[in-house]
Regions:
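A short, charged, Gly/Pro-tolerant segment at domain boundaries
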Residues: 249-272
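Exposed, interaction-prone assembly regions rather than primary DNA-binding/catalytic cores
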Residues: 103-117
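Alpha-helical scaffold segments in soluble metabolic enzymes
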Residues: 7, 11, 40, 52, ...
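HTH-adjacent hinge/linker in prokaryotic transcriptional regulators
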Residues: 1-10, 14-21, 25-107
Length: 272
């Protein structure tokens, strides 16, 4: 890219997607480049011109904001023949394969090492639906290692939690469409505290990605009014397995102590 195109690209990335919703002239003026530079960059991105780029952005925004009713209508309009079990399973398997294919393994390993570092606390949070993923993660990670905490995505719970968050601690955040302001604000504040943010989001990318060190996008579309969390669950369980492998000596000791406590409390049904 030319210097002007790099300048334009930087402006678009900093102000995405709003930067691309105005006219060519407005974008050129805001980025301090010429109008032909805007058109040329759009063409280099594979579009016939700026209108094509704008159309793609608008389609993406519609997908980001799509609610349960419109999802159901869209899926039902093009549903193939066959039982819903088969159609749903096919979609989920496709999601898993696509998710695994696009995850950067080096980023995954780096995130696991951050979470395995005993010098760092680990926090997790999520939105209305994805908070369940954060809770699942925290429940297991508390066995794997100490100093793991669930952050509820409500503003009155943030200050005490952020007070305990040190520079270098890890925040695992989940945010899928329609993206929640509470999650974005919490991630932003944690990043300002110096936390290392690991974000799990969807193909349309949560705004919280701007504050994440590592970002993993998972496929979520299924023939339903709701997005699927199966691929998120896969990623969470794989992360936990990776951390467990890295900390196994201390984790095994913690598990042995926990099992002894469970046995003493007769927590599980089993031997009399």
């Amino acid at each position: 890219m030319t210097r002007a195109e790099r300048q334009l690209a930087g402006h678009v990335l900093r102000h995405y997607p709003l930067a691309l919703l105005g006219s060519v002239t407005q974008l050129a003026r805001a980025a301090q480049v010429s109008s032909p530079t805007v058109v040329r960059l759009a063409q280099k991105m594979g579009f016939g011109g700026y209108p094509g780029l704008q159309g793609a952005v608008r389609d993406e925004l519609e997908a980001r904001l799509e609610g349960p009713l419109s999802k159901h209508d869209r899926w039902s309009a093009r549903a193939p023949e066959g039982h819903v079990l088969n159609r749903f399973a096919d979609a989920v398997l496709g999601n898993l394969q696509a998710t695994l294919a696009q995850i950067d393994q080096q980023d995954f390993d780096a995130a696991a090492h951050l979470m395995a570092d005993p010098a760092r606390k680990v926090f997790a949070t999520g939105g209305r639906i994805t908070l369940a993923m954060a809770e699942y993660f925290v429940t297991h990670m508390k066995v794997i290692r100490p100093e793991v905490e669930l952050l509820m995505p409500v503003s009155n719970a943030w200050p005490p939690a952020l007070l305990e968050m040190r520079r270098g601690d890890v925040l695992l955040a989940f945010d899928i469409r329609r993206y929640e302001n509470n999650v974005l604000q919490l991630v932003e504040m944690a990043a300002e505290q110096g936390a290392e943010v690991v974000l799990v989001t969807d193909p349309w990318i949560s705004p919280a990605a701007a504050h994440a060190r590592y970002r993993f996008s998972v496929q979520v579309e299924v023939p339903s009014a709701w997005d699927s969390t199966v691929a998120i669950q896969l990623l969470v369980e794989t992360l936990m397995a990776a951390v467990q492998d890295l900390t196994w000596q201390s984790t095994a000791e913690r598990m042995a102590r926990l099992e002894a406590l469970y046995e003493r409390a007769r927590f599980f049904r089993g031997r009399k």
